[in-house]
Each structure stands twice: as structure tokens, then as C-alpha cells.
């Protein structure tokens, strides 16, 4: 029989590679590991890669297995979901994987300048009603700049046409370098082992016949960032709390 939420929370609290710092816990108290992830936790100088909004954490675990020469930190606020990947990585004895339970809105409180090399955004909520909540908005790009190396890599993998289109316009508006972009990942020439890792939710999107979009771009440290001023057609489907809850057809 599977564990209930309380049992999973108890497990998470005991795991040595899990850090739980929701907004209230770090509101006025500095995070001890900030600037010390390499030295005190991973005990190496390998690049640190974040997965923001990791859900169950399968992508982070998959990347950690593929790249033992990189360090991976999965971030989400839902502890019961993260338990899956946290448990799997612990049982596998993976030393290059950690989990951080916190609100992504305060992600810059956990990492020092230049401490992170890459960010993965895997199937993030497109937040169609409010741009500042989108993980590819300039609001979040400015936060990422506080800890990402200059020209650090950002990967967006999404089922949402709205999120893909918005991100594409944001990149164009700010002249950010794009290394690869496709509207249909699994019918492109970039299907490799990394992008072939499929999470629980991704498989459900594929089973419904939705194409998976992917953008890999760089975020320079310099330059003022501007939001794109354009109307984008909203996603029409409903699933996993991603719904078009108003009569609007487009949004900025």
C-alpha cells in the first residue's frame, strides 16, 4: 500500500539531500547553504543545474544518472510530489542530486552570484492570466540573473502553445541567443537521450496527442529586459489545474 501525505512528509524531513524552506521559513533568516552548495553539500566543483517546478522529480533523477559530472537540484513547493524522486535518488545512492522545497518566487535567496550554470523549466504552469507568474517572464529572468552564470543556459520544455509562444516573443524582444527551438520535439532532429527523458505528466500529454515544444536559450547578465507587448491565443484544453477559467481568448 502506498504511503499517505503525512508519511511522505516525515520521510522528506529525514532525507539528507532534501532542504525544506517555504517562504515563511526564509522570510527573515538567511539560507545557510547559499554560496556553499559546491563545498558543503556536493563536495565538488561540478556545474549546478536547477529544475524549477520539478513535480515528482523524475527529470532531475534522469539527468543525474546521465551526467554524474554535474550536480542537480530539483525545486518545487509540493513535498508529497517530490517524495517520488527524492526517494528514488536516495535509494540509488545518488550523490549529485538534491531537492529543495520552496516557493520559486524566492529562488534567488538560495543561490549566490554565479553559483548555477543551467536551469530546466519542465512543463511549467503557463500562468496565462498574469505574465509575472510565468517562469520565463522577465520578472523571473531578473531573478535568475542573480545566481546564473553569464550566458547561462535555460531550457524550456512544454506542452503549452501559449507558454512556448510567449517565451519565443520574450526572447525576440530582448535579443537573447537561441541555441535550438522546435514546436514538435519528437519529430525534430534533436531527439537525444536528454530530451527523451519523459516525466509522468509529459507522457500524459503525448498520449493525448499534444506536441512537445522545446527552446534552449542563453541569458546574458547585461541588458535591460522588456516584456513583449503582444496578444497570444490561450490554450484551449483543461488538465492538471491548467484551465482557461474566463471567457478570454487571448492574453499578454
Curated annotation (Swiss-Prot):
Any keyword Flavoprotein? no
Which residues does substrate bind?
129, 159, 199-202
EC number(s) in its UniProt entry? 2.1.1.33
| Catalysed reactions, as listed in the record | guanosine(46) in tRNA + S-adenosyl-L-methionine = N(7)-methylguanosine(46) in tRNA + S-adenosyl-L-homocysteine
Q: Which UniProt keywords apply?
A: Methyltransferase, S-adenosyl-L-methionine, Transferase, tRNA processing
Hey, which pathway is this one from? tRNA modification; N(7)-methylguanine-tRNA biosynthesis
Q: Which residues are catalytic? A: 125
Q: What does this protein do?
A: Catalyzes the formation of N(7)-methylguanine at position 46 (m7G46) in tRNA.
State the name under which the record lists this protein.
Answer: tRNA (guanine-N(7)-)-methyltransferase
Amino acid at each position: 500500500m502506498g504511503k499517505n501525505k503525512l508519511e511522505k512528509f516525515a520521510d522528506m524531513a529525514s532525507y539528507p539531500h532534501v532542504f525544506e524552506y517555504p517562504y515563511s521559513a526564509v522570510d527573515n533568516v538567511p539560507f545557510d547553504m547559499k554560496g556553499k552548495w559546491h563545498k558543503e553539500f556536493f563536495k565538488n566543483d561540478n556545474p549546478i543545474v536547477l529544475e524549477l517546478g520539478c513535480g515528482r522529480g523524475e527529470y532531475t533523477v534522469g539527468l543525474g544518472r546521465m551526467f554524474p559530472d554535474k550536480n542537480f537540484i530539483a525545486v518545487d513547493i509540493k513535498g508529497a510530489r517530490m517524495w517520488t524522486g527524492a526517494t528514488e535518488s536516495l535509494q540509488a545512492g545518488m550523490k549529485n542530486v538534491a531537492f529543495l522545497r520552496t516557493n520559486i518566487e524566492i529562488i534567488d535567496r538560495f543561490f549566490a552570484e554565479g553559483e548555477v550554470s543551467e536551469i530546466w523549466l519542465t512543463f511549467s504552469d503557463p500562468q496565462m492570466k498574469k505574465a509575472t507568474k510565468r517562469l520565463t517572464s522577465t520578472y523571473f529572468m531578473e531573478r535568475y540573473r542573480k545566481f546564473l552564470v553569464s550566458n547561462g543556459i535555460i531550457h524550456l520544455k512544454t506542452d503549452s502553445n501559449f507558454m512556448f509562444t510567449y517565451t519565443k516573443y520574450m526572447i525576440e524582444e530582448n535579443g537573447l541567443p537561441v541555441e535550438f527551438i522546435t514546436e514538435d520535439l519528437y519529430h525534430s532532429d534533436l531527439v537525444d537521450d536528454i530530451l527523451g527523458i519523459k516525466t509522468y505528466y509529459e507522457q500524459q500529454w503525448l498520449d493525448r496527442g499534444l506536441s512537445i515544444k522545446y527552446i534552449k536559450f542563453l541569458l546574458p547578465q547585461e541588458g535591460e529586459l522588456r516584456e513583449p507587448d503582444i496578444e497570444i491565443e490561450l490554450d484551449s484544453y483543461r488538465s492538471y489545474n491548467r484551465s482557461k477559467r474566463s471567457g478570454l481568448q487571448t492574453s499578454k
